[in-house]
Amino acid sequence: MQAITPEAFRTIAKDASARWDAAFNAKQPDQVAAFYDASATLLPAGSAAVTGLAAIERFWQDLFAQGVVDHRIDMDEVTIDAGLAVQRGKWSAAAHDAAGTRQAFGGNLLLVYRRQADGGWKILNHIWNL
């Protein structure tokens, strides 16, 4: 497989983040889960690890049911080494409380990508804080 430069991966990660946000904001858990490697793990802030595509899809479905909206990933940095790449940045989203007031929240984000056999990239580990 051909080597990839950090600049090239930055473009890939920026595009993937925009498409991930679009799938999230459309409340499509199957489309969000499609961004993950078959053995991927989510490490949600303050919660247990979520491993495997079916569990990841259920996690996002449950989150959508809680009314989380307007997700956005802002990339700060990428690094790459052979078949793994790391994207560091910030995330933000919002939800409405019982009174209907919009509550914004966000935090730091770290995504580890694994290069796939077809040359594409999928998320292997996804961790965030609040």
Residue ranges of predicted features:
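Short beta-strand segments enriched in hydrophobic/aromatic residues
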Residues: 36-37, 91-93, 127-128
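Surface-exposed, charged secondary-structure patches
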Residues: 41, 55-99
